[in-house]
């Protein structure tokens, strides 16, 4: 058996896992910051997908109004923290992402025909990897979110005109929100 990283490959096999590590790592850092900062997630008729659906909040997009008064004042409130666990759980347990972060973050396996760090692979039958099997349940939750995201994309197509009426229009934000649903 080959030791970790040993291979007869001549190509730069390590580039893709390193770039994936940087990309996924940057996304995790950014999304964590975006979820906890709890501000600047709306602009006019646009609502950030990280905050959709906004259940409670101080914007006009909030479905149930302002944050509940029973929340402790010392607890930082962000509308994203109420909902991000569902699409995040779907993405984290998704087969594609599992393959990407297994290779890039755990180097298991690092690439095809490259030595692995361990030789006693147990698959996803033991804790904690058996938790990956909740993917099928997160799918149903993620599908519910598509309706809210589509609704937000539709709302993003209507802009307040100078006459005070709503007018149909398409901006860059509208295109991004619509592409997110598709």
Listing of model-derived features with the role each one plays in the protein:
Residues 1-182:
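Membrane-embedded alpha-helical bundles that constitute the cytochrome b-like, heme-associated redox core
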């Amino acid at each position: 058996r080959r030791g970790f990283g040993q291979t007869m490959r001549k190509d730069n096999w390590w580039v893709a896992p390193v770039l994936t590590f940087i990309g996924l790592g940057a996304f995790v850092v950014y999304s964590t910051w975006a979820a906890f900062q709890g501000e600047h997630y709306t602009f006019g008729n646009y609502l950030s997908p990280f905050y959709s659906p906004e259940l409670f909040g101080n914007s006009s997009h909030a479905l149930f109004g302002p944050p509940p008064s029973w929340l402790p004042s010392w607890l930082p409130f962000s509308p994203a923290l109420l909902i991000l666990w569902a699409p995040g759980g779907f993405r984290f347990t998704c087969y594609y992402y599992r393959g990407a972060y297994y290779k890039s973050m755990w180097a298991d396996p690092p690439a095809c025909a490259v030595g692995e760090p361990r030789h006693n692979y147990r698959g996803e039958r033991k804790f904690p990897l058996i938790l990956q099997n909740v993917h099928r349940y997160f799918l149903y939750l993620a599908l519910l979110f598509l309706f809210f995201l589509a609704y937000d994309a539709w709302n993003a197509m209507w802009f307040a005109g100078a006459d005070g009426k709503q007018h149909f229009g398409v901006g860059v934000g509208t295109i991004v929100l619509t592409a997110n649903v598709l």
